Amino acid sequence: MIKAVVFDLGGVLSDSSPRYLYRKLLKSETEIDEFLSTVCTPAWNHQQDLGRSWQDATDELIEKFPDKKDLILAYWHRWEDTLNGPFHQSVDILMDLKRRGVLLYLLSNYSPENFPKALEVFPFLRLFDGRIVSGFVKLAKPDPAIYHLL
């Protein structure tokens, strides 16, 4: 019998990507690719997942790329536009497991500033019996240490 299940948020329970935001702000996929590979890179975003403040993160990039200021700030201020909604089949599984009495845990890389917003956007996050959110514990996947917190 399964006693507990661990879920991730992004890519498992929710569909999110900065591309959703930048498709509204840039003209082509090529521009988006260039921006996300040279300015707001995955490595830069990972630092927020580890707990760096969005203010510090955006200040750093604006200093390097002053001509991209509005696009950089959009990543922070328009975070909700990076979301494309929940994966309903995954949420259905989550809810079914909850009804069956299975313990549910969330282990996710997320900024401590954005996770409270995610709780508002995704009410199903309140179903978890426990949550480990990278930005709050200052560890992030794929670091094995975060898994030991389960």
Question: What function would you assign to each model-found segment?
Answer:
Residues 98-104:
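Short, conserved structural micro-motifs that define repeat-unit consensus positions
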Residues 2-92, 99, 111-115:
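N-terminal helical cap/lid subdomain that shapes the substrate entry/recognition surface
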Residues 108:
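Conserved phosphate-coupling serine/threonine residues in phosphotransfer and NTP-handling enzymes
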Residues 112-150:
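Substrate-recognition "cap/lid" segment bordering the active-site pocket of phosphatases
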